[in-house]
Amino acid sequence: MIKKLSVLATFALVLAPVQVQAAASDDTSYTWSTPKLVVTYGLMGIAESGSIRAGVNSAAFVDSAGRLRMIFEGGSPSDKKWSTVSSDGGANWSVDSAFRWPTDIQASFGHISVVAAPNGGYRGFVRNETGIASVYSTDGQTWTKESGLRLTPSAFGLEKLDGGGVAKLPDGRYRMYVGDESSYFRRCGSDKAVNTKIYSATSTDQLTWTVDSGYRIGPELGTRCNLHPHAFVDPSGAVGIVFHVNNDIEKSNSEWQSSCHYALSTDGLTFSAPKRIPATMKKTSFGTENMADDCDLMVMPDKTLRLFASLFGPGPEGNQIFMSTGTAAVKTTSTTAAPAATSPATTKITKITCVKGKVTRVVSGAPPKCPAGFKKK
């Protein structure tokens, strides 16, 4: 029996694989705009440097003022938390100088995700080697640390967690999705037979979590690493996980090195076959591949989507964040033109003269016919 967590999750993981799905195909449900960089060295007012990041590992949400807000780590020092805001849906961004992150939380806690808290405000989840911690804000701008950890790696039988994205379920509970970042570069970069899974835990208050049995995403994409899950609720009400897949770390395959994938579920446990989001950007420092890392997907009030992804690695493109807008694809159906209307045929009435002995009759018709015993004259 799975026991409830007080602050830390207890180990209660049973491997019960979900049905293996086919490898991901490109998403066609949405049309994705050409990605554009929204966190840049210029915006942050710093020079491009291999040791300083403009921004990576983002979380986006609509704050209490109705602005699109993004929190990420970057700048100098590179693990400091920053926030940018946009009042026009992401077309223009500015650094929020009034943003306040708690100083009493370790800088090593990264990969933030944000969800609306049950009693108002916002709760953010961050992780490091020890587990997943949480922070709280009433407005999305000023944050305070919450005591303890929400989940630990040992609760899942893992060495290190990543992700921590949370979605609200249809029944009012919350589900958190975490990835396996144990020995990340060794396993995902060198061991070609590796496959990392995405797991989940459930909560009623976002503070105490129960580990769910099995895994949510696993071998569906073959021997690749499924990393840094974020969660969202799509316009249809389905629960979604968005995560990035490493095709082959540190190797050029002239296609894509990493990209965002997402999968949907009606209950947050059993997911559809993952779809690959085609929005990526090129990184010349790694050859010709397209890249998208640490993906975050959110639904705007107008039901359009915003995808945020990091470009890791050295410049000139690296260590910046791009955005792509997703709009529901318009389904077209072929129609057969109706046949042209035809005018009714015109009926011509004619007359003939019919005789029978001395009797004569004029008959009209189309065509006219003489009565019985009469002959046409």
Question: Where are the model-predicted features located?
Answer:
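Carbohydrate-active catalytic/glycan-binding domains of CAZyme proteins
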Residues: 25-332
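Disulfide-bonded cysteine motifs in exported proteins
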Residues: 138, 183, 349, 364-365
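Short Cys/His-rich micro-motifs in 6-15 aa windows
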Residues: 374-377
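Short amphipathic beta-strand/extended segments with alternating polar/hydrophobic composition
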Residues: 126, 360-366
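Extracellular mucin-like PTS domains
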Residues: 332-343
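A short beta-strand micro-motif
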Residues: 350-356
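Secretory targeting and sorting signals
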Residues: 1-24
